[in-house]
Amino acid sequence: MMKKYTNFVAIDVETTGLNDDSEIIEVGLAIVEDGAVVRTWQSLVRPEKPIPKDIAIMTGISNEMVADAPAWSEIEDEFLQVIDGHWLLAHNYLFDKGRVEFQLGRSLPNDWLDSHDMAKLFLPTLSSYKLVSIATHLHIPDTNHHRALNDAVVCAQVFLKLMDDAKQLDPFVLHEMAVTYNGQQESLFANSSCSLGDLLFRLAEAATASAPALDSLDFFEPSYADPYEMPRLRFANAEAFFAQDGILAKMKPDFQYRAPQVDMLDCIKQAFATDKHALIEAGTGTGKSFAYLVPALLWSFEHDARVVIATGTINLQEQLFHTDLPFLKEALGHPFATAIAKGRSNYLCLRRFSEYCRRASTASERERVFATSLVLWHAQDHSGDREHLNLNKAENQYWQNIASAPDTCLGRRCPFYNECCYFNSKRQCEQARVVITNHSLLFQDLKIGSLLPEYDRVIIDEAHHLEDEATHQFTDTVDFELMQKLLNNFSRNGGFLGRVTVALGKADTLAENSTEIAERANRAMTDTVDAAKTIGGTITFANNIPELSNIGDLRITDKIRNSGWWLTLEESLRKSHRAVTTAVTSIRRLLNSLDEDENIESLLREMTHAHDRLAEQRDWLERFIAGIDDSFVYWAKTYKNFSYANLLLNAAYIDIMPLVHEKLFEAKKTAILTSATLAVNKDLNYTANKFLLEPGEYLSSINESPFDYEHHSLIAIPNDHKDYSKTSDFEYTRNVISDLKALIPAVDGDMLVLFTSYAMLNKVQQALKDEPSLNGYRILAHGQDGSRSSLLEALQDGEKTVLLGANSFWEGVDVKGASLRTVVIAKLPFTPPTMPVESARNDLLKSQGKNAFTANSLPQAVLRFRQGCGRLIRSNSDRGCIIILDNRVLTKSYGRTFLDSLPKQPVWTDSVATLADKLKKWHNEP
């Protein structure tokens, strides 16, 4: 029965682009018989339009190569003969199918299967589903990526390997996958054509029972520490772990003693022993993670006390838990009790997932693949943690249907309670003595409690983000899209009201209440939309949002509240508030009237949660309208292509630090704040003052990077442009373009250019792509050419690349070696003073008689600048240059603050042309 799936043709096409009218420039076919590639067919194709530069760079197919190639019409008949009578395989088949049928001018009768979908199903945790990534994972050679014949052969080999591996899975799991995908039984597919659904049933038939059955697997396997097994070290002599002849040296052949690492550990030891807080800057290469994990583990064991470690990013959280902690447990000779804590929505709800699988067959093809892939994932990984999955944008939306959520949770009454992924995670955290979490969950716990187990010592890594995260977590946001969704659930027959009526069979009893609630919910929806449109239109007009701007923010100041036009906005908001209040009251009355019938227990929880969220939105809207709390800044936010659905009304603390000090530093015995960038001009006073820390309550330590910056790095600053303050945005952008055109060939690519705005980034990319002298370089842009991770992969794939990045690219980019040899700072990263929170904080500082620029704007920019420059040297062997195109570091009195905050290294200042010559020679030095 499997034979028909071992005879097929794999196809790949290279094209002039990704648009609907893109032309094929190469086609490759791999003919498979009895599970082996028996012959191939390939041809270049001459397109009617020229091949774009970026396509030529990616594929290696130039206009010269296809000049004498046949047109599609000349190879069409032979192509059709080769594929005749076969089903076709491609990677992301809709693209190849679409391009071929576009060239043919008609549809093909052949069945199609997708190797991408097969990989999604059987490799659900793969980090990338590019063909080359799948091939690498399966140990299949891929010698000429982005050439059609090579990719067709690799595609065939990937499919065959996945099919062979699938046969070794538990037949029960395969059968569950088939039923989830199809929603039908095998007999209906006995004579079907080739399809993914049919293939799943055939694989279940052919599978051997080599894996344990799904229901025999343990869902919860906590890691308990043996209390009688002592670690190899005591807390008091933890620094011995890093000694020249210590434990780490014996376990790592490339070990190098780092004095800054030991200094950092000593500071943490003192803070723990004396119940003090600490501010610790640890430069790149210090070994920061081990420096705080070792004392945390030993302290938690010896004192039977919990230590929480919070990171700014999920990536670091995962690294600590899945890489660093297992290594240290082995090194220290003790299975310390550790756990990872994440937000509830990160975990799979088994009850919702079970229901989702039963109805998945009626969903779209993409959603069916998603649901089916999770059947295998959960059979192999019972943590239910979505971080182990690689979800795209659409799949993230699907996940919301199966994620653990308070509004749908039945608690102990749930039939899956004992296996619950979320509660198992909570139980592990309660048993653990070292808990790894993230800033977001840390502050949610500080705000509402009960999310993390009790603790009195915390280590916060990536602490330069702490103020922003605290501000975000304590911001109240009126979300008009959310209000519409909540109201919509009560406004239609298919929503909550209809489901209650069906479940209880009390149509007559509920009819009157249902009609009243539906009418009031509809009225609230109408009034809310009207209010959103009124405010959104005003913001757009007031800010005159530029064509390339993404966000429009309007700070609602006292001056605006006293203006005539505000009265119109306020009345519109009040009308919406009254309508929502009326709807909330009616919903509450209905909830009070419903008995706790077990038939609607889950539904009642959903309705109650929706009511509570709607009431919360109503209360926040009331606060926003009143605007009487001077400790808050109020603003409205909308996005490009405004609609009522993307309007947000926000209220945030102007100065969040008193609350942070109360919730964190006053409540905990020890809070360690660490980062590569806490100091300004090699001084921690700015950070200490920001967090309201008094000299006697904290320790401090600045641990410089052990890397040799003086010999491996330099700073280049062009000095042949006008003073920045005398330059328009248009002229400055033109200067950046001109400078990059000269500098990119000089350093031969391998460059990251950091921007503070997408508007400038987009203009620069277009100009560089149009520059003939840069034809040999791939110019990629954040927001234009793929996700952050895919762009970083491209930077390291060996091609000469210039990556233009904004926002997130200023930090967290860890590219070692020759793939990144130049970092360019296009503009100093000052936060725009018109941003609502920044504006309000500056106003507060001015009212206190302080200089807002030196007290706030400058130090924040310096820390951001240091983060950006820190992308360059990531290892002892790295070598490269930092180019600063913003001449304010030379012309302004505060410019030295930026330069003096960097590690000591040569600084070159000259014309762009001269710098280009010097950098070319320097890069070519051994």
Model-flagged regions — what are they?
Residues F219-A225, F235-G246, D304-R433, G495, ...:
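A substrate-engagement module of RecA-like helicase motors
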Residues R232-L279:
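Conserved pre-motif I regulatory segment
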Residues Y292, L298, E318, P326, ...:
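Signature of the SF2 helicase/ATPase Hel1-core->accessory helical subdomain module
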